[in-house]
Amino acid sequence: MSADEVNIDTASLEELRDILINKTGNTKLANRFRALFNLKSVGSEDSDKERAHKAIKYIAECFNDDSELLKHEVAYVLGQTKDLYAAPYLREVLENDNQQCMVRHEAAEALGALGDKESLPLLEKYFKEDPLLEIRQTCELAIERIHWENSEKAKNEVLEKSLYTSIDPAPPLATNDSTSKVEKLKEILNDQDKPLFERYRAMFRLRDIGTDEACLALASGFDDPSALFKHEIAYVFGQMCNPVTVPSLIKVLKDESEAGMVRHEAAEALGSIATDECLPVLQSFLNDSEPVVRDSAIVALDMYEYENSNELEYATVK
C-alpha cells in the first residue's frame, strides 16, 4: 500500500511518520501536511505522555527534509504542543545555519510559544549576533514573550477571551477603552518607533476584534519594511478568513519583489478564505519560481478543495 493510500485519520503513529517524512519518495505534499496535523493532535493532546513524546519525536524527524514550507510548519507545530520536550529539537534548528531562514525563524518563534526559559541565553545570542533581520526580530519577540509570560504584569492583565486557540508570538493588548478603538490600535501597529512586541500585541488585538474595519487596519501593515511583520499579518488574515482581506492578500502574493515568507503566507491565507476569486489566483502560482510560494499554492488549493467540500476541517486537528 502506498503512502497516499493509507487512511491518514486511522493511521498508526509510525504510518503517519512515514507519510510525513516521505519514506516512499512519492507522497503528495498535501498528505504530508495532513499527517503532520494528525501527529500534532497526538503530540499536544494525548494524555499518554510517552505516546505524545513519540509523536513529537516523529514530527522533528522531518527537519532533515528539503521542503522549506513543510519544515517551517513542523517548527510551528512543535511550538503549539505546549510541551518542553520539543524544545531541544527547536534549539538545534535555530543553531543550524544550513537551515533556511524561514525555518530557523519559526523555530525561534516556537521556543517563545513554549515559554522555554532555558532557551533565553540562546535567543539572546541570536538576537544580538544573527546576520538576518528576520531571525533577530523573531528572537526579540520570543524573549519578550517568555519574559511577559513569567511576569506579574501577565497575571494582572485582563485579556479578552480569543476565538483562536493558537499560541501567538505576542498576546493581544489588554482590554481597555483605548485598545477597543481600531484607529488607536492601527496607530500602534504602524508605529515603527514602538517595541515590536507592543506592535504585535496591537496586531493580535485587532485580529480578535475581527471587524471589517479591524481587517483594513491590519492590511495597512503590509506597507511595513519588515518581512517578518508582514508575514504575520498574512498569517492572521488566514485565521480570520474574512473576504474583505482578499484584495490585499492577492496584491502581496503577486508582488514578486516581496519576500517569499510574506508571499507564501498570503497564498495560504487565500486557501483558508477560499472564496471563488481565490481559486484562479492560487492556480496561477503553481509554477512560481519561488519554491516556498509554489508549495504554498499546492497546499492552499488542497485546503480550498477541503473548504468547499463536505469536510469540516483540513485535518483531524487544524
Swiss-Prot record:
InterPro entries, sorted = ARM-like, ARM-type_fold, Deoxyhypusine_hydroxylase, HEAT_type_2, PBS_lyase_HEAT
Q: Where does Fe cation 2 bind?
A: 231-232, 264-265
The keyword Nucleus is assigned to this record? yes
Q: Name one GO cellular component term.
A: fungal biofilm matrix
State the PROSITE patterns in the record: HEAT_REPEAT (PS50077)
- Give the UniProt keywords, A-Z: Cytoplasm, Hypusine biosynthesis, Iron, Metal-binding, Monooxygenase, Nucleus, Oxidoreductase, Repeat
Q: Where are the HEAT-like PBS-type repeats?
A: 70-96, 103-129, 262-288
Required cofactors, per record? Fe(2+)
One of the protein's GO biological processes: single-species biofilm formation on inanimate substrate
Q: Has UniProt tagged this entry with the keyword Cytoplasm?
A: yes
Catalytic activity reads: [eIF5A protein]-deoxyhypusine + AH2 + O2 = [eIF5A protein]-hypusine + A + H2O
Recite the UniProt cofactor note for this protein.
Binds 2 Fe(2+) ions per subunit.
Q: Which residues bind Fe cation 1?
A: 72-73, 105-106
What GO MF annotations does this protein's record show?
Answer: deoxyhypusine monooxygenase activity; metal ion binding
Where does this chain mainly localize? cytoplasm
Question: Which EC number(s) does UniProt give?
Answer: 1.14.99.29
Pathway listed: Protein modification; eIF5A hypusination
Its localization reads:
Cytoplasm; Nucleus
Q: Which cysteines are joined by disulfide bonds?
A: none
| Family, as annotated | Belongs to the deoxyhypusine hydroxylase family.
The job of this chain, per UniProt, is described as: Catalyzes the hydroxylation of the N(6)-(4-aminobutyl)-L-lysine intermediate to form hypusine, an essential post-translational modification only found in mature eIF-5A factor.
Protein name in UniProt: Deoxyhypusine hydroxylase
